[in-house]
């Protein structure tokens, strides 16, 4: 199962690196200046930073795991983006 979210932000690269570094202390994570991948027990998150957009793709084996992965990515991104309180992360299933 797969879902994706495209988040408008001028700080996509910074947030992508923060997410990868943060989770990299607990689970396997790799990244470069534009892309990252985090491998959780419940699935995998792929990230891509563009100049004005952070794209996230979540993959998991079942709906419950996918929902957990979306929630984890959403909550941590919003924590790092606290200066953007109106940030909306809308996941699209199957996208």
Predicted regions and their residues:
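Eukaryotic, polar/proline-rich low-complexity intrinsically disordered regions
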Residues: 1, 46, 93-95
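Short glycine-/aliphatic-rich beta-strand segments at the starts of folded cytosolic domains
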Residues: 1-10, 15-18
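Beta-strand/loop substructures that line and gate deep hydrophobic ligand-binding cavities in soluble
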Residues: 41, 45-60
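Ser/Thr-rich, low-complexity intrinsically disordered terminal regions
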Residues: 25-42
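C-terminal structural segments of small proteins and small subunits
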Residues: 58-95
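Charged, terminal alpha-helix-loop-beta segments
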Residues: 8-11, 30-32, 48, 71, ...
């Amino acid at each position: 199962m797969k879902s994706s979210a495209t988040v408008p932000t001028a700080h996509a690269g910074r947030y992508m690196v923060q997410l990868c570094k943060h989770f990299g202390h607990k689970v396997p994570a790799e990244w470069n200046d534009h892309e990252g991948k985090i491998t959780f027990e419940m699935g995998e998150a792929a990230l891509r930073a563009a100049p004005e957009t952070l794209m996230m793709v979540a993959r998991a084996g079942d709906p419950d795991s996918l929902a957990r992965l979306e929630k984890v990515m959403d909550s941590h991104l919003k924590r790092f983006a606290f200066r953007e309180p109106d940030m909306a992360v809308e996941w699209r299933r199957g996208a």
